[in-house]
Amino acid sequence: MVRVKICGITSLEDALMAVEAGADALGFVFHEDSPRHVPPEQATGIIAGLPPFVQTVGLFVNRPIAYVNETAARCRIDLVQLHGDEPPEFCAAVERRVIKAFRVQDITSLDPIKHYRVAAHLLDAYSPKAYGGTGLTFNWDIAAAAKEFGPVILAGGLTPDNIREAVEAVNPYAVDVSGGVESAPGRKDAAKVREFIRRAKA
């Protein structure tokens, strides 16, 4: 069964709602340019209120390695998601398991993947304007092809309306959603979250 990560959590209320709906992991965005940015102290408080067996993921974009490791330790997050231009040697210096994001334009976007030794590869749609959270989709056949390099987390424009089709097309290790289940940036819509998870795991 595919696993589901709900990203862009900004409140304990949304976090607990997502867990109750069946989310396997929650994402916290430590990228100040994002409308879903959450300060480390706020994330720490939310994470402290979570029940056991829920994985937490911290998302970083081109931050210094010291900041990544210090924030991960301070907030007690389980995995680090690197969504910028971080090279393989940067990933190797992270003191948590790493999910490396790759922004997909075409099949050549997979070329760098083989150089990374990480826990999973997250595939998101390319946009020249942002490092993620754009709501754009990409060719899911490329995501299916990426599975030969390791576990794939499918992201990019996923919604309750297209998640079933996406899972059937790719059969990814996990799916990642943010804007597709929101009523406003950083505010999750409970009905959308429940429907997304139900269809993803159907």
UniProtKB/Swiss-Prot annotation:
| Pathway(s) | Amino-acid biosynthesis; L-tryptophan biosynthesis; L-tryptophan from chorismate: step 3/5
What keywords would UniProt list here?
Amino-acid biosynthesis, Aromatic amino acid biosynthesis, Isomerase, Tryptophan biosynthesis
Question: What single Pfam family name could you report for this chain, choosing any that match?
Answer: PRAI
Q: Which GO terms describe its biological process?
A: L-tryptophan biosynthetic process
Q: What is its EC number?
A: 5.3.1.24
The molecular function terms in GO held by this entry are: phosphoribosylanthranilate isomerase activity
Catalyzed reactions: N-(5-phospho-beta-D-ribosyl)anthranilate = 1-(2-carboxyphenylamino)-1-deoxy-D-ribulose 5-phosphate
Q: Which family does it belong to?
A: Belongs to the TrpF family.
- Put simply, this protein is called N-(5'-phosphoribosyl)anthranilate isomerase
What is the protein's species of origin? Geobacter metallireducens (strain ATCC 53774 / DSM 7210 / GS-15)
